[in-house]
Amino acid sequence: MGKYLEKVFRLSQYGTNLKTEMIAGITTFVTMAYVLATVPNMLGNAGLNKSAVMTAVILLIVITTCAMAFYTNRPFALAPGLGSTGIVVSMITNEGISPEKAAGVIFLSGILFIAISFLGLREAVVKVIPVSLKHAVSAGIGLFIALLGAKSCGLIAASEKKNCLTFGDLRSPEVILCLIEFCLMLLVKIKNIPGGIILSILITTIAGIPLGVTKLPDRIISFPGKMDDIFLNIDIKGALNTAYIPFLIALFIPDFFSTFGTVLGVGAKAGYLDEKGNLPGIEKCFQVDAVSTSVGALFGIPSMTTYLESSAGVEAGGKTGLTVIFTGICFLLMLFFSPIVLMIPTAATAPVLIYIGIHMLGAMKNIDYSDMTEYMPAFLCIGFTIFANNIANGICIAIPVYVLMKLISGKVKEIQPVMYIVTAICILYFITLI
C-alpha cells in the first residue's frame, strides 16, 4: 500500500507522509462539512427532496474530489457552490422555472466549462492575468475567508441601523468560544503541535456542550435517501430557451472567476505557484471542475466548484491529492453518520477560517506599490471581494480597471491581447447584474 501511495501521490517528493495527509484531509472535511447542512436545506426549501439531495451531494463530493486527487494530485476538494445554489433556488422559487429546466441550465453551464477547459482557453485566461492581480486574488480570498469565519460565529454582524458590518454580541457563548479557540490555535501553531487544528476544533466542540453551543444529535446513525426523484430529472431542451441566457451567464461567469481565484489562492498557500504566479497543471484542475458541474446537473445539484476550505487542509500540512482522498472518505461515511459531524458548531470552525485568511494576506507583499497601474487594480480586487461579498466581483472590477489604467498611462504594450476579451466578459457580467 505504501509503495502504491508513493507512486501515485509522490509523497516524498512533496515532503509529506501518510499521517500528515490524513490529518490535513480530516481538517478540510471538518471545515467544509457545513455544506451538508446548507445545500440540502436550500434546495429542499425550493421543493426538491431534501433526503435525496443530501445523498446526491455526499456522493458527488466524494466522486469529484477523488477525481481531482487522482487526476491532478492537488489537495483541492469540490462541493456544490453556495452562490450557484442560491441562484438556482431563486430561479425555481422567484422566477417559476421548473427544477428540471434549472438542472438543464446548470448542465449547459457545465458543457460550456468543459469546452473552454479542454480547449485550454481557461488556462490561457489565467496566464494573461497580471502577476499583481494574481497576488491580489490570493489576498482578497484571504480576507474573504477571514470575514466568512467572523460572520459565521457572530463575531461580525450586519447592523441594520448603521447599514454596515459591526461587532456582533461579544457576550454570546458562540463568540467567546470562537475567540478562545483562536487563541488556542495560535498556541498550537507556535508550539508546532501536530494536528493542532483538529485538536482545537475538537476541544471547542466539547466545550460548547455545557454552553448550549454544541447541539447533541438525537441519533447517531442515518441512512441515505433514494435519489429516484432527482437523478436524470433534467430538461436540457427546455433550458435552451433564450430567456434563460441571463441565468446561464450568472452561473457561468462567477464560477469561472471564483474557481480560478480559489485554485490560485489555495495553490499560493501551498507554495505551488511559479515566479509568474501561475499554477503548473492548472488546466487539469479546471477540467475536473468543469466535468463535475455537468455531472452534478444530472442529479439536479448546482455547480460543483473547488472549495476555499481546501486551504484548511493545506494549513494542516496537506501537499498532495492524498489529502482530499481522506476528505472524500470522511464524506462517504456521512451517508450513515451525518448527525455526528453536523453537531460541530460554527464557533469551532470559524477560528480556523479566520486564521487561514490572515495567513493568506502575505501575498500582498508581492504587489508592486511603486506603480499605480499595478497597485490600484490590485487594491480594487481585494477591496471589492470584501465590499461586494463575492470573489468574482473583485476580479471582474479589477481587470477592466487594469486595462483602462494601462491605456491611459500609455503602457499599451503591457496589456496582453486576450485581456481585452476578458475585459469584455467582465463588463458583460456586470450588465447581467443590472
Residue ranges and their predicted role:
Residues 1-53, 164-167, 201-283, 426-428:
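Helix-loop-helix hairpins and the membrane-proximal interhelical loops
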Residues 2-39, 60-61, 70, 80-141, ...:
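Helix-loop-helix junctions within the multi-pass membrane cores of secondary transporters/permeases
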Residues 16, 20, 32, 36, ...:
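Electropositive phosphate-/nucleotide-binding environments in soluble metabolic enzymes
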Residues 43, 71, 188, 296, ...:
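Helix-capping/transition residues at the boundaries of transmembrane alpha-helices
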Residues 47-66:
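Loop-to-helix transition at the N-terminal end of transmembrane alpha-helices
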Residues 55, 104-107, 249, 287, ...:
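Internal alpha-helical transmembrane segments of multi-pass membrane proteins, especially GPCRs
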Residues 95-210, 214, 325-434:
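Membrane-embedded alpha-helical modules
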